[in-house]
Amino acid sequence: MNNVLVLKSSISGNNSQTNQLADYVIEKLQGNHIVVRDLAQQPLPYFDTVAAIAVRGEPKTTEEKQLLALSDELIEELKNAQTLIIGAPMYNLNIPTQLKSYFDFIARPRVTFQYTAKGPEGLLKGKKAIVLCAFGGLYDEENLVTQYMKSILGFIGITDVQFVYAQGIGLGAEAIEKAQSSAKNKINELITSL
């Protein structure tokens, strides 16, 4: 049995193409231990000065201690997962702020990465990630969502990353159907190796 962490980040709820793809993955992975965290339905606090102090220093106030406990909880979920499924739609050329806040809370020095003489080294090695991306238009792999997700996951040590794209969903119903079908075929290929 595989431990799977599914991160949803779309603000579109059930109408979201990435949420629909994430639900498809969940359905296909029944029998595994699956934890779902919907970052849009249950958003994390905005990562501000108080949060930065909490996760990078010695928390002193009650609020700082609560934010550190939240960071610890998120990191523990991630550490327990062998496979990470991330719904990462494109909003204004980038990932949703809800997903960015998640990475701000889990990217912690000496916990999920460390600095070395050769540069940063991720500490969450040996995990697989599948990133589900829905784009209104048609983009190549140099788009900001793909580049950011590769970078942040690699930064924390997750380098076995596969992408599933549902592109052109802003082009109408026929394009959505085609994008979903193509994405589901790719998902079917990828989950056989989990």
Curated annotation (Swiss-Prot):
Gene Ontology molecular function terms on file: electron transfer activity; FMN binding; oxidoreductase activity, acting on NAD(P)H as acceptor; oxidoreductase activity, acting on NAD(P)H, quinone or similar compound as acceptor
E.C. number: 1.6.5.-, 1.7.1.17
Assembly and oligomerization: Homodimer.
Family statement drawn from the similarity comment of this UniProt entry: Belongs to the azoreductase type 1 family.
Catalytic reactions of this protein: 2 a quinone + NADH + H(+) = 2 a 1,4-benzosemiquinone + NAD(+); N,N-dimethyl-1,4-phenylenediamine + anthranilate + 2 NAD(+) = 2-(4-dimethylaminophenyl)diazenylbenzoate + 2 NADH + 2 H(+)
InterPro entries the UniProt entry points to: Flavodoxin_fold, Flavoprotein-like_sf, FMN-dep_NADH:Q_OxRdtase_AzoR1, NADH:quinone_OxRdtase_FMN_depd
Keyword Isomerase (UniProt): no
Function: Quinone reductase that provides resistance to thiol-specific stress caused by electrophilic quinones. Also exhibits azoreductase activity. Catalyzes the reductive cleavage of the azo bond in aromatic azo compounds to the corresponding amines.
Keywords assigned by UniProt, alphabetized: Flavoprotein, FMN, NAD, Oxidoreductase
UniProt: FMN binding residues: 10, 90-93
Cofactor entry: FMN
Binding note for cofactor: Binds 1 FMN per subunit.
Protein name: FMN-dependent NADH:quinone oxidoreductase
